[in-house]
């Protein structure tokens, strides 16, 4: 009984440590942008994400199972706050660019990206190109 309780405490502590490590890695690894996505009723939610530039566009990446990803697929117009400026964009899923975008994310965010790759299948993430809608 004591062994089971100790094992449970160890597992729960390890999970908590992993969650905290991923949060710290995601927030401290470099630039974090704020994206406001909207539902069909116009209500917005803000999500903090990593961003990279590739060619003439900014890219985000996400998992199709995440809530913010589902919102931007249904309502692709978003607002992105980056470097103190807010701009409007249309989100365009760009699966064909998974490899170069993942490489850029890894270069830019280093250890933080590696930690996240441990718990996520990076073959599932979808790069999202941001097309400017103007001011």
Where are the regions that the model predicts?
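Terminal leader/tail segments of proteins
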Residues: 15, 24-32, 36, 129-132
